[in-house]
């Protein structure tokens, strides 16, 4: 059974330019997205599923690009793009979130504004259809940066969010992944195999993320995930952690991470890329390569990032067999890829 996507595109952009520094319009803008990195091998992917991923990546990035082209903000583009990916069960975020050890779904997300360094994050929510929207509301409507669990959902209700029945997040493929991991645990008598996800026969990390540069020169980044299959004890990965899974700073770059969260937290991946650009004076591509190809593997982790700098240069760096990814520039040139050797 092929996982499906909801193609109802919910554009958050209302046609009004709300970017900062409107007087300094520029033509350079761009957007980059990812749908997760991991052991994604072509021989384990059938044509139908591969096409579904490619189509959804293209659909999602065009939502954000349309907003940017019309003069919308990078924050608007990032939130709307991730929102659309959360509504697609192909990805481990929102509708397609993986199951915890207990058979529930715990969702995480974060977003950051490169112009102000304001940020919002949420972790461990079970009744929020689009966690990226709640992360944005936490940034805009609360005095805090990060809320979790029941408290985050109480805040969401106060802000007018509708609570979603947990059955909405159920997909047969994700349940099969959980059951397979539990079977492996029993055979190996392993304490926890949360890092092994047999979905599409391989371990992979289906986090979704987006980074964007708007016409006003403002950067933004966002990330959303269901975490790791079979996670326990309210485990939180890098996706909702500002500086690890998400970071944006107008003076350097915007970064969204995907990978083995424990290592990305320890390496503070997203912020480290920005810091290397700021303090060492190296390019985005150089910084991303050092962090993803050296620092993260040296700790024992794997995964990848997408990033864009203040000049519109991009990076799609990963140390796994594949990463669902796409990029679109101001000229409308589109690149969509899945595997390493493309």
Question: Where do the PLM segments sit?
Answer:
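Alpha/propeptide regions of enzymes that mature by internal proteolysis
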Residues: 9-342
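C-terminal motif of bacterial Sec signal peptides marking the signal peptidase cleavage site
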Residues: 2-4
């Amino acid at each position: 059974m092929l996982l499906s996507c909801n193609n109802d595109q919910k554009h958050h952009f209302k046609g009004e330019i709300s970017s900062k520094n409107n007087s300094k319009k520029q033509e350079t803008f761009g957007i980059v997205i990812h749908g997760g990195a991991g052991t994604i091998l072509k021989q384990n992917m059938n044509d139908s599923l591969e096409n579904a991923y490619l189509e959804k990546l293209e659909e999602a990035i065009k939502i954000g690009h349309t907003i940017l082209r019309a003069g919308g903000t990078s924050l608007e583009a990032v939130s709307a793009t991730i929102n659309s990916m959360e509504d697609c069960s192909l990805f481990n975020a929102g509708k397609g979130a993986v199951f915890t050890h207990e058979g529930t779904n715990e969702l995480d997300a974060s977003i950051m504004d490169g112009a102000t360094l304001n940020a919002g994050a949420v972790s461990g929510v079970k009744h929020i259809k689009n966690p990226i929207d709640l992360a944005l509301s936490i940034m805009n409507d609360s005095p805090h940066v990060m809320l979790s669990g029941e408290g985050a959902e109480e805040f969401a209700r106060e802000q007018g969010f509708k609570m979603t029945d947990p059955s909405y997040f159920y997909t047969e493929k994700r349940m099969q992944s959980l059951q397979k991991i539990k079977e492996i645990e029993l055979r190996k008598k392993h304490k926890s195999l949360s890092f092994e996800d047999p979905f599409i026969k391989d371990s992979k990390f289906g986090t979704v993320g987006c980074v964007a540069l708007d016409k006003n020169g403002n950067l933004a980044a966002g990330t959303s995930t269901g975490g790791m299959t079979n996670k326990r004890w309210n485990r939180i990965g890098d996706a909702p952690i500002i500086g690890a899974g998400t970071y944006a700073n107008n003076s350097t770059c915007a970064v969204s991470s995907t990978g083995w969260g424990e290592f990305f937290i320890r390496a503070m991946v997203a912020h480290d890329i920005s810091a290397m650009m700021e303090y060492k004076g190296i390019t985005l591509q150089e910084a991303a390569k050092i962090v993803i190809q050296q620092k993260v593997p040296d700790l024992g982790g794997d995964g990848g990032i997408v990033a864009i700098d203040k000049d519109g240069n991009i990076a799609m760096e990963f140390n796994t067999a594949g990463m669902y990814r796409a990029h679109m520039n101001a000229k409308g040139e589109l690149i969509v890829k899945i595997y390493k050797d493309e």
